[in-house]
């Protein structure tokens, strides 16, 4: 580019040889000078302008490619984040449901344990009442038996005299003696 600029400067200071020369005063230029200047500008400027436009185009395309890659990467990250969010929500729902089911299970277990304890207490109470009733009945039986024995002894003592007593003893000894010989 520096060479192109020096060429224009060189042409501008070129001494005119007669009829052809480069007039740098734009207002005093003629059509030929303008055509030459425009032609030189197009010839040399076309490459420079094309290089500038190509560089700009490459930068724009590169920026677009980078933006597309970033967009794809962002979309992938967003999809991964959505999938992860869904997994976390499912796990949270599962933990919540498991927590509720654990609470319900513990509640049912507690109710069952309490019910079993109440049944055992009721059974123990009934057994205790039964044993107390049996003990009271046994005590009554013992008293009745003792009173009956005492009454019978009293009756026997009052009815038996000494001779009747001796006769009963001899009869019992005779019965026992005959039982012994039979064996």
Curated annotation (Swiss-Prot):
This is ATP synthase subunit b, chloroplastic. Its main location: plastid. It is found in: Plastid, Chloroplast thylakoid membrane. HAMAP family: ATP_synth_b_bprime. The chain crosses the membrane at residues 27-49. It is a single-pass membrane protein. Keywords: ATP synthesis, CF(0), Chloroplast, Hydrogen ion transport, Ion transport, Membrane, Plastid, Thylakoid, Transmembrane, Transmembrane helix, Transport. GO terms for cellular component: chloroplast thylakoid membrane; proton-transporting ATP synthase complex. In plastids the F-type ATPase is also known as CF(1)CF(0). The gene is atpF. GO terms for molecular function: proton-transporting ATP synthase activity, rotational mechanism. The keyword Ribonucleoprotein does not apply. It comes from the Eukaryota. InterPro entries: ATP_synth_b/b'su_bac/chlpt. F(1)F(0) ATP synthase produces ATP from ADP in the presence of a proton or sodium gradient. F-type ATPases consist of two structural domains, F(1) containing the extramembraneous catalytic core and F(0) containing the membrane proton channel, linked together by a central stalk and a peripheral stalk. During catalysis, ATP synthesis in the catalytic domain of F(1) is coupled via a rotary mechanism of the central stalk subunits to proton translocation.
């Amino acid at each position: 580019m520096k060479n192109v600029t020096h060429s224009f400067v060189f042409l501008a200071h070129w001494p005119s040889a007669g009829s052809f020369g480069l007039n740098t005063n734009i207002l005093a230029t003629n059509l030929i000078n303008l055509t030459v200047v425009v032609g030189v500008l197009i010839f040399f400027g076309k490459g420079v302008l094309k290089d500038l436009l190509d560089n700009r185009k490459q930068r724009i395309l590169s920026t677009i490619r980078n933006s597309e890659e970033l967009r794809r990467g962002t979309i992938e990250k967003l999809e991964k984040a959505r999938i992860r969010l869904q997994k976390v929500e499912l796990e949270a729902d599962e933990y919540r449901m498991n927590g509720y089911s654990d609470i319900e299970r513990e509640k049912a277990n507690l109710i069952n344990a309490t019910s079993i304890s109440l049944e055992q207490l009721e059974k123990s109470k009934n057994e205790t009442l039964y044993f107390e009733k049996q003990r009271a009945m046994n005590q009554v039986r013992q008293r009745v038996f003792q009173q009956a024995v005492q009454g019978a002894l009293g009756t026997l003592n009052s009815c038996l005299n000494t001779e009747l007593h001796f006769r009963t003893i001899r009869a019992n000894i005779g019965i026992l003696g005959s039982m012994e010989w039979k064996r």
